Amino acid sequence: TLPISFRKLLAGKLIVSAILSFFLGIVCFAFTVVANFIMGYDGFALIPALTGLVQMALLGFFLYLTMLPIIVLTSRYKGSFLVGFIVAFLYGFIGMFANGTLQSIYPVSAALGLINYRAGAEGVMWNKGLCFISILIMCAIGIALMFVKQKPEKREAKKTQHTAPKKGW
């Protein structure tokens, strides 16, 4: 056992995960720029590239915040990684179908609103206030779940097996 509470251990893991999600957004940007040069696309410009860097890094962080409740819940149970992965995938997949006002409310698509994602379309309007509130609510739920006390697991009494003494020598 570790001489640290589960809550502190979880908080440390969540902080490291937040930093990693931001960093992986930067890594995604780097791969995008490298792919741009490998494919030989024209029109690379520094200002849009820097805007893309900021957007991709923040998108990684905001998506982490939207998934925070799922991460906290699945961290409480042994062997629940796959369940958390499936739930997070479905949660993100449903976000592709959000449009209109729902687009600013649904947390996964609200992350796109906070980075001002346009998908190449003109006239895309995001309600940034709703986007911010949506992600803030998910973050608050995740933090609140961290402080909810976990039910103690029922432990079965270990039965000791007595071996019969060997006969003979």
Give residue spans per PLM region.
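Residue-level signature of transmembrane alpha-helical entry/exit and packing/kink sites
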Residues: 51-59, 63, 80, 84, ...
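Short helix-to-coil transition segments within interhelical loops
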Residues: 1-6
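Terminal transmembrane helical anchor/hairpin motif
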Residues: 85-166
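Transmembrane helix-loop junctions in multipass membrane proteins, especially transporters and channels
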Residues: 29, 33-45, 79-83, 100, ...
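Secretory targeting signals
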Residues: 11-74, 118
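Functionally important transmembrane alpha-helices
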Residues: 65-96
